[in-house]
């Protein structure tokens, strides 16, 4: 096989290849390390961490659906200080970049967790703006352009690592939201997060999820994700990380053709612990098939 250039830059950080994990589906990599050589990944995006521990939502909080799954886990996490103490040293054993996804209930929450990560040995921060803003009546930060710009600007001001902003698809105009994130100082954009959905137990006549609604992920959302990645990539000048239903190399290639510089594998990890490796191998096979020497010959070449 001919040597191919798989390297990409995300917000000025060099990744050996475009394949990474999607936050919330890979923990901090420990559970998967016996199945996956973490050294082969472009980056590990860890499960979201907050300034303080979060207990998450009541159970049941996972439901299978046709072509995917619903989750209402509620960003359960031990807090940023426990993450720094327990997980960074483990990940630094591997030759991969570390991206920390952060969550918050207020702008101040986001800033506090970012400040605590300032001296941590990590590479990038991913700002999850799909959280409800408790100071704005519970409206999700990511659904209002003004709030997106405000929280991005505040976090960017205190961040010591490059900042990725992760967009929710539960909006009318994804381009408007992406532009607000860039105006606030986002160095890169990742999308999409989960689509809001619901499942009903027709025999018990009640919602299957205790939280009633949850986030839909998996193959079912891929067409929506591709459309939004394509729209955003054509509207902003920062790198895009595409996700939403990626399970094969062919899926990843489609996202890169639509304009994504990086691709994140999420729900597929639950069904196949080696999904990230198979996606990477699939990209390499595609490059060999079409005699592509550099990954950039694919990105945005629709």
From Swiss-Prot:
Q: Which residues bind substrate?
A: 47, 71-75, 128, 193-194
- A single GO BP: 'de novo' pyrimidine nucleobase biosynthetic process
Which first-to-last residue range defines the signal peptide?
none
Report the co-factor binding details.
Answer: Binds 1 FMN per subunit.
SUPFAM superfamilies linked? FMN-linked oxidoreductases (SSF51395)
The cofactor required is: FMN
Q: Which reaction does it catalyse?
A: (S)-dihydroorotate + NAD(+) = orotate + NADH + H(+)
InterPro entries noted in UniProt: Aldolase_TIM, DHO_dehydrogenase, DHOD_1B, Dihydroorotate_DH_1, Dihydroorotate_DH_1_2, Dihydroorotate_DH_cat, Dihydroorotate_DH_CS, Dihydroorotate_DH_I
> Its Gene Ontology molecular function terms?
dihydroorotate dehydrogenase (NAD+) activity
What Gene3D superfamilies does UniProt report for this protein, alphabetically?
A: Aldolase class I (3.20.20.70)
Localization (cell): Cytoplasm
**Where along the chain is the active site annotated?**
131 (nucleophile)
Q: What does this protein do?
A: Catalyzes the conversion of dihydroorotate to orotate with NAD(+) as electron acceptor.
In the record, the note on similarity to other proteins reads: Belongs to the dihydroorotate dehydrogenase family. Type 1 subfamily.
Q: What do we know about how this protein assembles, alone or with others?
A: Heterotetramer of 2 PyrK and 2 PyrD type B subunits.
Q: Which PANTHER family match?
A: DIHYDROOROTATE DEHYDROGENASE (FUMARATE), DIHYDROOROTATE DEHYDROGENASE (QUINONE), MITOCHONDRIAL-RELATED
Record-given protein name: Dihydroorotate dehydrogenase B (NAD(+)), catalytic subunit
């Amino acid at each position: 096989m001919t040597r191919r250039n798989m390297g990409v830059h995300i917000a000025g950080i060099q990744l050996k290849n475009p394949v990474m994990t999607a936050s919330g589906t890979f923990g901090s990599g420990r559970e998967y390390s016996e199945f996956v050589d973490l050294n082969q990944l472009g980056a590990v995006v860890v499960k979201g961490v907050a300034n303080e521990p979060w207990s998450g939502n009541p159970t049941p909080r996972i439901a299978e659906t046709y072509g995917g799954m619903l989750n209402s886990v509620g960003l359960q996490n031990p807090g940023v200080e426990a993450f720094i103490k327990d997980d960074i040293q483990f990940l630094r054993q591997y030759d991969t970049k570390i991206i920390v996804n952060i969550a918050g209930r207020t702008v101040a929450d986001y800033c506090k967790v970012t400040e605590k990560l300032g001296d941590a040995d990590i590479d990038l921060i991913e700002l999850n703006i799909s959280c409800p803003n408790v100071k704005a009546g519970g409206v999700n930060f990511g659904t209002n352009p003004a709030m997106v710009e405000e929280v991005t600007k505040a976090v960017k001001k205190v961040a010591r690592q490059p900042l990725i902003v992760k967009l929710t698809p539960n909006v009318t105009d994804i381009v408007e939201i992406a532009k607000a994130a860039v105006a606030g100082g986002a160095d890169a954009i990742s999308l999409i997060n989960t689509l809001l959905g619901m499942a009903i137990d027709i025999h018990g006549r009640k919602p299957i999820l205790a939280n009633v609604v949850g986030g839909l992920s998996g193959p079912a959302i891929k067409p929506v994700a591709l459309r939004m990645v394509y729209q955003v990539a054509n509207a902003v000048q920062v790198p895009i990380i595409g996700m939403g239903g990626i399970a094969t190399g062919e899926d990843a290639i489609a996202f890169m053709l639509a304009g994504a510089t990086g691709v994140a594998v999420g729900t597929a990890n639950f069904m196949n612990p080696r999904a990230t490796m198979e996606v990477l191998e699939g990209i390499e096979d595609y490059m060999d098939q079409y005699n592509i020497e550099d990954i950039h010959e694919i990105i945005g070449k629709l």
